[in-house]
A protein has these predicted regions:
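Alpha-helical transmembrane-bundle signature of multi-pass membrane transport and export proteins
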Residues: 1-202
Length: 202
């Protein structure tokens, strides 16, 4: 069961990272194509990145309060429709630039909590076995590093073939896939509650 959970977590983090890296290329290209303005493209990039600087530290407290698994689930579940809404609203003629900025800002706000949950969920899942922790950590780091390299390259291949809007739909699907993997195969952890009880009895 634990091996299945770790494998699902590694797969979820790889898929989610792949989607994030594809978005970093597909979203600016989408803005440039739809607005024809490099300035607006730069502004969208700034709005997407800004939450990383502002919410980095508070995200750690959020993970401690909600738990890493819950934070990861909420982050992926929120990012999927937020990202899919961008090309969908554009296709229906309802995407103003102000609304685009709002969606991108919200999308960016869920990035820091997800990254913070990545750092804490593995120890919760694996436990205190240093050998297993090292093996699992190597799998996660290697997989996400590979996804970080493949994501932009894959986006560069898919954008000319599918178009930037459809690539954004693909990116949204990766977040949904990550959500389903964690929801169905990564169990809730009770270690924090148990440790809190041990401290109280001591």
């Amino acid at each position: 069961m634990r091996k299945t959970a770790v494998g699902a977590l590694v797969a979820a983090e790889i898929v989610s990272t792949l989607g994030s890296r594809m978005t970093y290329l597909a979203l600016p290209w989408f803005v440039l194509v739809t607005t024809g303005s490099p300035g607006k493209m730069t502004l969208v990039l700034a709005v997407e990145i800004a939450p990383m600087a502002v919410l980095g530290i508070p995200s750690g407290s959020l993970v401690q309060r909600l738990g890493a698994r819950t934070t990861m689930l909420v982050s992926d579940f929120a990012r999927a429709p937020l990202l899919a809404a961008i090309p969908l609203l554009d296709a229906t003629g309802h995407l103003s630039f102000g609304l685009l900025l709002a969606l991108v800002a919200l999308l960016g706000c869920f990035m820091p909590p997800y990254f913070a949950s990545q750092r804490t969920i593995l120890p919760e899942l694996v436990g205190e076995d240093e050998r297993r922790m090292s093996q699992a950590n190597s799998l996660v780091e290697g997989g996400t590093a590979m996804a970080g390299l493949i994501g932009p390259a894959l986006a560069g291949v898919l954008i000319p073939v599918l178009g930037a809007p459809n690539v954004l739909y693909v990116d949204a699907a990766t977040y949904l896939a990550s959500f389903l993997l964690v929801l169905t195969l990564v169990p809730r952890q009770k270690r924090r509650r148990a440790s809190a009880g041990a401290r109280a009895s001591g």
